[in-house]
Swiss-Prot record:
Disulfide bonds: none annotated. Its EC number is 6.-.-.-. Keywords: Coiled coil, Ligase. Involved in bacillithiol (BSH) biosynthesis. May catalyze the last step of the pathway, the addition of cysteine to glucosamine malate (GlcN-Mal) to generate BSH. InterPro entries: Bacillithiol_biosynth_BshC, CC_BshC, Rossmann-like_BshC. GO terms for molecular function: ligase activity. NCBIfam families: thiol_BshC. Belongs to the BshC family. It is an enzyme of class 6 (ligase). Pfam families: CC_BshC, Rossmann-like_BshC. It comes from Bacillus licheniformis (strain ATCC 14580 / DSM 13 / JCM 2505 / CCUG 7422 / NBRC 12200 / NCIMB 9375 / NCTC 10341 / NRRL NRS-1264 / Gibson 46). Residues 454-482 form a coiled coil. This is Putative cysteine ligase BshC.
Length: 538
């Protein structure tokens, strides 16, 4: 493996200006990306207290299923009052989901190791598994290449309820068939049987989406001491209950703070992405396995679908009695994270940078400062045969990452279609139509009822010319097929579905092709947090 870096600007203006350190962004964050921010943040954390022992005890109990001494040792370090964490999170995607999940975990591990050396305090890597998330349509599939086409390979399920990923059961039989379908799309290698066997074993010991995700991630990263915090686990709610009540107490202030921040964002020409904050209490309530967002109006909290209504005091009592029924939304999840963890830094994807910028006031309402928000590594894997095709087809690497190869393919093909031929067909259509129009006019003078028949005849003649043109173009496509497929292969590998590679493809393809040490080699590359696009040549 070889690492190279490219300067590729984000398409999101807010993210781009944040990374470039524009002054307009300062009102949205408490810390910048400069080196001075780290010692300031460390000092700020030293003035706060955390229930470290309760958190460590809970995590040790939760991590028993992984049977990892390394993970347990890392958890014990949380008891040290000087310890801090680097945290990032993602939904519990099948087979770990899109590549950006792996890139985010590597970013967490890398920054934690780097800051521990620089700051001389224990810095612990934590991955926040969004097990409380109920948007299963986002995690119930992976993409595969089928006959050169990118296709969504969805796990069959009779009915997708609005249940948390941590509580959504996996049908083992259906999931194994689904897994076999993925491997059927792969080229069989010397690693295939062992990898498939390992994934099946992880699947069989998993009861839910979150289980399957965590067993895979733990296996990949447990030697790095990565800690997993499943936000959908009922056991974490006892630690969160007190803060849920604080969120209710300051609910109106939270709502107002988000609205003000969003208005400021709009005034500066940026686009907020959090929706409906004014009507929501920003807390979910679970009943019969489904999540419902609590709304508020005139001091009352309610869920229309369930015909439920509470006063603030009644809802606080319910949280005390049954904390497992409550969970966070996009606004309160970052605040809960700040409450539970001594967070040195939050590793964020582009979308998270945008919506965290809407929450600075919310952090202040709860008495916190927003932690430094560090952009995760953005990575493209460049396979050797794809790199060769880029060179052969005259496509720059940067261009392929930013735009793909579709436009180059179209240009190449158009250059192969003789301009004289298309012009000749166009002229023939016009001349024949002019002649036929005159003939139609004479025929109509003889018999006015012939109109429909004459129009049909004219259309038939034009269709024959169209057929001729398409046939010639198809022959050119067949002749140039080998080269045209090269453009398609570049597009599929680097810019599938016109999206960044990291948003579509899954790590299992690379593990199957390059073997179990692929991940170790990838983790050990000399990355730097200089906001450059990382290209890993395979």
């Amino acid at each position: 493996m070889q690492l190279t870096e490219l300067s590729i600007q984000s398409q999101n203006p807010f993210v781009r200006d944040y990374i470039n350190g524009k002054k307009e962004i300062e009102p949205f964050f408490d810390y910048g990306l400069s080196n001075e921010s780290w010692s300031v943040r460390l000092d700020d954390l030293s003035s706060r207290t955390y229930d470290r022992d309760a958190l460590a005890d809970y995590l040790l109990d939760y991590h028993r299923k992984f049977q990892s001494a390394t993970m347990n040792e890392t958890i014990e370090r949380l008891r040290d009052p000087k310890s801090v964490v680097v945290v990032g999170g993602q939904q519990a995607g099948l087979l770990t989901g899109p590549l950006y999940t792996i890139h985010k975990i590597v970013s967490i591990l890398l920054l934690a190791k780097q800051k521990e050396q620089e700051l001389n305090v224990p810095v612990i890597p934590v991955f926040w598994v969004a097990g409380e998330d109920h948007d299963l349509e986002e995690i119930n599939h992976v993409y595969i290449s089928d006959g050169g086409k990118v296709k969504k390979h969805k796990l069959p399920q009779s009915h997708w309820k609005k249940s948390q990923a941590a509580k959504t059961a996996l049908d083992a039989e259906k999931a194994e068939k689904w897994l076999d379908g993925i491997f059927a799309s792969f080229e069989e290698t010397e690693y295939t049987n062992d990898l498939l066997g390992h994934l099946r074993r992880c699947l069989r010991q998993s009861l839910s989406f979150t289980d399957f995700f965590e067993f895979l991630v733990a296996d990949m990263f447990e030697q790095d001491g990565l800690i997993l915090l499943n936000s959908g686990d009922p056991g974490i709610r006892n630690l969160e209950a007190r803060f849920f009540r604080q969120l209710l107490d300051k609910n109106d202030e939270l709502t107002d703070s988000v609205k003000r921040q969003q208005e400021l964002m709009k005034q500066l020409g940026y686009t907020p992405i959090i929706e409906g904050a004014a009507q929501h209490a920003n807390i979910f309530y679970e009943r019969d396995g489904e999540r419902f967002l609590i709304e508020k109006e005139n001091g009352a909290f309610f869920i229309k679908e369930l015909h439920l209504q509470w006063s603030e005091a009644e809802l606080c009592d319910l949280i005390c009695q049954n904390p497992e029924a409550f969970s966070n939304n996009v606004v309160t999840r970052p605040l809960m994270q700040e409450y539970l963890l001594p967070t040195l830094a939050f590793i964020a994807g582009p979308g998270e940078i945008n919506y965290w910028g809407e929450l600075k006031g919310a952090f202040q309402v709860m008495g916190y400062k927003m932690p430094p928000v560090v952009p995760r590594l953005q990575v493209t894997f460049l396979e050797r045969h794809i790199e060769k095709k880029l060179d052969e087809r005259g496509i720059e690497l940067r261009e392929s990452i930013e735009k793909g190869a579709r436009a180059k393919k179209e240009q190449y093909f158009q250059d192969k279609v003789p301009s004289g031929f298309t012009d000749s067909v166009k002229q023939a259509k016009e001349k024949i139509e002019n002649i036929h129009s005159a003939v139609r006019a004479e025929a109509l003078e003889i018999d006015g009822s012939l109109g429909p028949l004459l129009e049909k005849n004219a259309g038939f003649i034009q269709d024959q010319l169209q057929f001729l043109e398409k046939t010639v173009i198809r022959r050119i496509e067949e002749k140039e097929n080998y080269i045209l497929r090269d453009f398609d292969k570049i597009q599929t590998s680097i810019k599938p579905l016109d999206a960044p590679q990291e948003r579509i493809w899954n790590i299992v393809y690379y593990l199957n092709k390059y073997g179990p040490d692929f991940l170790e080699k990838y983790k050990d590359l000399p990355y730097s947090f200089q906001n450059m696009h990382q290209v890993v040549k395979l």
